[in-house]
């Protein structure tokens, strides 16, 4: 719905209050329906997830997701109006509250048998305290951004506008569900495709190594949060295609730097982030996992063409193709290769989606990306990373030396863009 909000916010003939009210009422209605149905069938859902004794956790999770959904439109308004301070404030305060509550419930409270401020630690809740902290974080975030609902009015709901929005957004929503399949279904295949104890071990290893890839994921999410409103606000500019190409260059460069920086220092980073020494066997698949995350980011940047041209069904088709690839590879190869199959499935899926989106977009909504330069940067990044990983894994001097050479190459090759940025500042 955020994407739809940004898209229709650029149409000058649509009243802002009408747009906000239509989008907000749609999300509020869907959120409450989701919450009610989830609560009514909570036990059935818990049984389906094979956690029949954790219904309370599921209920907290339902409330958390609903509240997060309610916060999307006011958060989108802040992003659209160029209010990064208020937006980041809501995220930072929420994150700090979450961190404090986790430390309070898990670290401090168990040390005080008589409780703190009348609150006593209940060992039966256990990990449930993390869910409670998440719920509080969601409530705080909504409370901070909620003032943006000032433009909301039931009377301003426009059914015809709602139909246009839904026609644009439903493929995006289904594509989002397919994307969730691409990112999470591999754990389920590991769970059901391997013997129970082996599955538990491999899921632990696979989940642990994904922590390293979150460095790329966090950057991608931060980039998208900032850049998506700009894509829509500038799509009528005569030089917008040139700008989109430059932004892709910047995105790829930043991701290449993150990728190489992680890879040449992977050994000591893994020692700090993987935790359990049993998970160290999974370090071998980290290059694949991170490269898949990088290609997913490029795909999401490429996807702007079908959003700007109102061809959102293309995103649905590409996501379904990706989901089919994910399901096939995991189903066919996990019994023999375990999490290696999942890692390759993710890489092949995101590579395929990236390539399909590029060629489809070139035919329908041409944006002249600097493909040759991007391929050179990606190839050098992969080559440097693999050389360091395979031959100099614990020789940080050589690995980081290669990293610095790559940075020097980038600085020289991008000197014109760097000079423009420096002159502006």
Predicted segments, located by residue:
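Membrane-water interface segments that mark the loop-to-transmembrane alpha-helix transition
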Residues: 1-43, 52, 56-59, 65, ...
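Membrane-interface junctions at transmembrane-helix termini in multi-pass inner-membrane proteins
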Residues: 7-11, 67-91, 149, 153, ...
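Specific pore-lining/lateral-gate transmembrane helices of multi-pass inner-membrane transport
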Residues: 9-24, 205-319
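Alpha-helical transmembrane segments of multi-pass membrane proteins
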Residues: 28, 32-36, 49-74, 131-132, ...
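Hydrophobic alpha-helical transmembrane segments
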Residues: 88-150, 321-325, 339-360, 400-404
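Membrane-proximal transmembrane or re-entrant/amphipathic helices at the cytosolic face
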Residues: 388-425
């Amino acid at each position: 719905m955020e994407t739809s909000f940004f898209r229709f916010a650029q149409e000058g003939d649509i009243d802002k209050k009408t747009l906000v009210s239509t989008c907000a009422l749609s999300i509020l209605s869907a959120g409450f329906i989701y919450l009610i149905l989830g609560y009514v069938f909570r036990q059935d859902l818990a049984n389906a997830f094979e956690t029949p004794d954790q219904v309370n956790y599921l209920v907290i999770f339902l409330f958390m997701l609903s509240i997060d959904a309610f916060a999307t439109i006011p958060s989108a308004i802040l992003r659209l109006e160029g209010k990064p301070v208020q937006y980041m404030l809501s995220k930072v305060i929420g994150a700090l509250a979450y961190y404090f509550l986790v430390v309070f419930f898990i670290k401090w409270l168990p040390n005080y048998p008589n409780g703190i401020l009348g609150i006593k630690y209940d060992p039966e809740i256990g990990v449930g305290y993390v869910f409670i902290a998440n719920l509080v974080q969601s409530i705080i975030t909504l409370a901070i951004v909620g003032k943006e609902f000032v433009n909301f009015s039931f009377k301003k709901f426009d059914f015809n506008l709602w139909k246009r929005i839904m026609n644009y957004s439903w493929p995006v929503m289904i594509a989002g569900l397919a994307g969730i399949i691409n990112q999470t279904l591999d754990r389920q295949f590991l769970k059901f495709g391997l013997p129970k104890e082996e599955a538990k071990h491999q899921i632990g290893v696979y989940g642990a190594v994904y922590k390293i890839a979150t460095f790329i994921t966090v950057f991608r999410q931060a980039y998208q949060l900032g850049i998506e409103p700009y894509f829509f606000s500038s799509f009528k500019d005569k030089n917008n295609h040139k700008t989109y190409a430059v932004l892709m260059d910047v995105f790829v460069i930043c991701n290449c730097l993150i990728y190489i920086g992680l890879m040449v220092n992977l050994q000591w980073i893994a020692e700090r982030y993987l935790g359990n020494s049993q998970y160290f066997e999974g370090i071998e698949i980290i290059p694949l996992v991170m490269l898949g995350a990088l290609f997913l980011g490029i795909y999401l940047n490429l996807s702007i063409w079908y959003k700007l041209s109102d061809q959102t069904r293309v995103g649905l088709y590409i996501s379904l193709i990706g989901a089919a690839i994910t399901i096939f590879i995991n189903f066919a190869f996990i019994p023999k290769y375990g999490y290696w199959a999942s890692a390759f499935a993710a890489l092949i899926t995101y590579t395929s989606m990236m390539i399909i989106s590029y060629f489809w977009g070139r035919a329908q909504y041409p944006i002249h990306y600097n493909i040759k330069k991007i391929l050179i940067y990606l190839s050098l990044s992969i080559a440097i990373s693999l050389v360091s990983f395979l031959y100099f894994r614990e020789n940080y001097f050589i690995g980081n030396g290669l990293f610095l050479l790559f940075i020097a190459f980038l600085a020289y090759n991008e000197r014109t863009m760097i000079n423009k940025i420096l002159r502006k500042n």
